[in-house]
């Protein structure tokens, strides 16, 4: 997949594309519906395309999150799918070209007319696909129907995709953020269509887990991922993006029993032997085991960790049969 960074007016391209536009934070089921509609547009456009070049499925997205770039809204400095993770997932979903807009107050000041009449034609756009909540132009005052009306003037059709609902509630990134803030990782996975995943590099720690018989990998917090609420989770882990997966017990919190400080993340992998220091771990959240707790001492903490690990083993047994 080709990634094109946009910091102003896009460079001119003759490559024809069907363009899905949105923040796509999380790439949840609603976003996936937009991408499926865009893929349908690609197939239709290939029939009509007279240039001889294949039409590419393309996405335009924005980074950092507009709510952070413009308002510094707390929490939105982190994303459900930061740029690297978003790129990986979009590639897996079959997107061929990604236009990533560096979203700034200056970019936000572009008028709706400039966006449609200047930007889109330079990107080789044959069709645009957006969701019903899409907004654009100065102050975000223009919506999907405004986009359709402007694009009609230059012969670009616009498809507006209705929202996806689960249990009577619209699937949205903000809803998923709220679920993670409550530790409801199973429910978040339903809306995402996959487990919620973060990536972190293993850093050195105090080796307290190893002293208790449960060696853990301590993960650096890059500050880019939305994190679930503190607690203990059953997770699945890949090392350096490899295909092999290990179940693990993941702890996120301040480790009050051993006088920890600040938010720390660590994971104990079941049936793993090896040195993980310096490696990147992809951690997918499967279930929440318990809240963070302060115990009377290390002995009680060790007993609880044993119970946590046994809970993860039960996950393995239920998964395999």
Feature map (PLM): residue ranges:
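N-terminal catalytic cores of NTP/NDP-binding nucleotidyl/phosphoryl-transfer enzymes
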Residues: 10-77, 82
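Phosphate/ribose-recognition catalytic cores of enzymes acting on nucleotide-derived substrates
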Residues: 205-321
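Residue-level signal for inorganic ion chemistry
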Residues: 28, 90, 128, 188, ...
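N-terminal Rossmann-like or analogous alpha/beta NTP/dinucleotide-binding catalytic cores
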Residues: 66-132, 136-154
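Glycine-rich, Lys/Arg-enriched anion-binding loops that position phosphate/diphosphate groups
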Residues: 149-253
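Short acidic-hydrophobic, aromatic-tinged amphipathic segments that line or gate anion-handling sites
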Residues: 2-9
